[in-house]
Amino acid sequence: MSNNFKRTDRIAEMIQRKLALIIPQEIKDPRLKGFVTISAVKVAADLGHAKIYFTVLNEDKSVVTNILNGAASYLRSALARSITLRTVPQLHFIYDESIEYGQRLSRLIDEVNPPDSSSDDNN
């Protein structure tokens, strides 16, 4: 069997696509004003649990994490209606800090190597 992707990877990708559609449509919490983006999904080998990594713009990440984890059982049932799996994994939402980390590194690089404006003045 020479599949390029494992079954868990295919399921994770499907869950990511479906949740990206379900969350904006189904979550009506007034505290959730920002735009939630699902950045990655990691599914356990036994398909019992799924870690959902997300980012959010202009919102408190701990509040959004609590909202999403509070709605996890509802999102799981909405997900079960839209996909065909024997069992839908339990969802655990985790804030993805990789984007903030990348922005922080970019700022540090810009501080160390500022744009050379003096060469523009000499030309």
Curated annotation (Swiss-Prot):
Domain of life the protein comes from: Bacteria
Subunit: Monomer. Binds 30S ribosomal subunits, but not 50S ribosomal subunits or 70S ribosomes.
CC annotations in GO: cytosol
Pfam families: RBFA (PF02033)
Record key words, sorted: Cytoplasm, Ribosome biogenesis
Gene: rbfA
Protein role: One of several proteins that assist in the late maturation steps of the functional core of the 30S ribosomal subunit. Associates with free 30S ribosomal subunits (but not with 30S subunits that are part of 70S ribosomes or polysomes). Required for efficient processing of 16S rRNA. May interact with the 5'-terminal helix region of 16S rRNA.
Cysteine pairings via disulfide bonds: none
Matching HAMAP family: RbfA (MF_00003)
Localization per Swiss-Prot or TrEMBL: Cytoplasm
GO molecular function: ribosomal small subunit binding
Protein's recorded name: Ribosome-binding factor A
The family this protein is said to belong to: Belongs to the RbfA family.
Gene3D superfamilies: 3.30.300.20
